[in-house]
């Protein structure tokens, strides 16, 4: 696998099998709304202000710059739980030193509003959120397509979704992972944050490719015979039987890394039959590799073989990255939808755990690449 020479953008496989659904989606402030859900309640005391803001068509960094220019707080002294995209309307939380509170009394900006102010002991850090609630409005939806959307949503609600990294991770042209690979090869870059982002994009690209390979395996396990699975994956008859026996779409493998869902430690899948029950109950999920020296190692068998197919040519860079694990399979929570036939609008709302992308869910539903 020669990533440097690839000229096309890799397109991960979908878990659902329906044909593409016609709908118009624009990531504007009326049709795409994100609401952060904090990880904890704010105490009401301490040396930090927590600002609940609503930004429209601004990145988080652009919002911080506006607040910095108004309050005099250095950008590095602000805290946030997650970086949000420019497009759409976002309700999120930021922290800043309380001593600058007076500078906010007359704050006014057409794209940025301060809705509430709390106090707390700690500065907000990346990851200090439970997840995000999303509102998406699709337009120009015919009744026949609305029925297809409903069926796709019911299927995802029942089975879960592929927790790919979204197109936002990979830059304007979808290939900034190549720059990350160049840095790992020795290319110099002074901007430390950009350097880290590009290397992260490289890790994310490999994660997506491995997850896509697991989706392919799951489709094959559902559609092919034991004999065919043995021929394709060079596995034993017993392993093929185990795959065919699993009723859920995403197939677990003995020896792979699992994690307690949605927050929890990693462990190896040693007793497959026991872990399948916990997986179906959504207590655990499979964890894909973000390559690096400190990532939890896969055990053995087909899980390791499939992983090696993706990562074998990049092992020389392993020591240059910290590495970790990420859930490959996630679940929609608090899902609801409504269809307005007169306006031809189809509205969807759901909650995702932190780190998951609403655009990935939308691409799965529509079977369209939003990047294009």
UniProtKB/Swiss-Prot annotation:
Signal peptide: none annotated. PROSITE patterns: TRUD (PS50984), UPF0024 (PS01268). Its EC number is 5.4.99.27. GO terms for cellular component: cytosol. One of its GO terms (biological process) is tRNA pseudouridine synthesis. It comes from the Bacteria. The active site is at residue 85. Responsible for synthesis of pseudouridine from uracil-13 in transfer RNAs. Belongs to the pseudouridine synthase TruD family. This is tRNA pseudouridine synthase D. The lineage of its organism: Bacteria, Pseudomonadati, Campylobacterota, Epsilonproteobacteria, Campylobacterales. The gene is truD.
């Amino acid at each position: 696998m020669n990533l440097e020479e690839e000229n096309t953008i890799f397109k991960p496989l979908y878990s659902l099998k329906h044909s593409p659904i016609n709908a118009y989606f624009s990531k504007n402030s009326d049709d795409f709304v994100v609401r952060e859900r904090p990880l904890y309640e704010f105490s009401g005391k301490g040396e930090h202000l927590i600002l609940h803001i609503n930004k429209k068509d601004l990145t988080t960094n652009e919002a911080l710059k506006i607040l910095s220019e108004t309050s005099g707080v250095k950008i590095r002294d602000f805290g946030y739980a997650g970086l949000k995209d420019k497009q759409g309307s976002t309700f999120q939380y930021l922290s800043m030193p309380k001593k600058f509170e007076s500078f906010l009394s007359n704050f006014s900006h057409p794209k940025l509003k301060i809705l509430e102010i709390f106090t707390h002991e700690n500065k907000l850090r990346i990851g200090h959120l439970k997840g995000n609630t999303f509102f998406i409005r699709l337009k120009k939806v015919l009744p026949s397509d609305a029925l297809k959307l409903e069926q796709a949503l019911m299927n995802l609600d029942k089975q879960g979704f592929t927790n790919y990294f979204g197109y936002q991770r990979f830059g304007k042209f979808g290939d900034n992972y190549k720059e990350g690979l160049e840095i790992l090869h020795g290319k110099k870059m002074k901007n430390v944050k950009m350097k880290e982002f590009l290397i992260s994009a490289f890790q994310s690209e490999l994660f997506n490719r491995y997850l896509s390979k697991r989706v392919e395996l799951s489709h094959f396990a559902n559609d092919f015979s034991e004999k065919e699975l043995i021929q394709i994956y060079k596995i034993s008859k017993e392993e093929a039987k185990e795959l065919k026996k699993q009723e859920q779409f995403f197939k677990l493998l003995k020896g792979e890394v699992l994690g307690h869902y949605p927050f929890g430690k990693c462990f190896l899948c040693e007793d497959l039959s026991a872990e399948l029950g916990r997986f179906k109950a959504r207590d655990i999920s499979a964890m894909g590799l973000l390559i690096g020296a400190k990532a939890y190692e896969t055990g053995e068998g087909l899980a390791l073989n499939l992983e090696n197919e993706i990562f074998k040519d990049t092992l020389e860079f392993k020591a240059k990255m910290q590495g970790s694990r990420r859930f490959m399979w996630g679940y929609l929570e608090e899902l609801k939808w409504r269809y307005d036939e007169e306006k031809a609008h189809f509205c969807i709302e759901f909650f995702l755990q932190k780190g998951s992308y609403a655009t990935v869910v939308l691409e799965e539903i529509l079977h369209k690449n939003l990047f294009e």
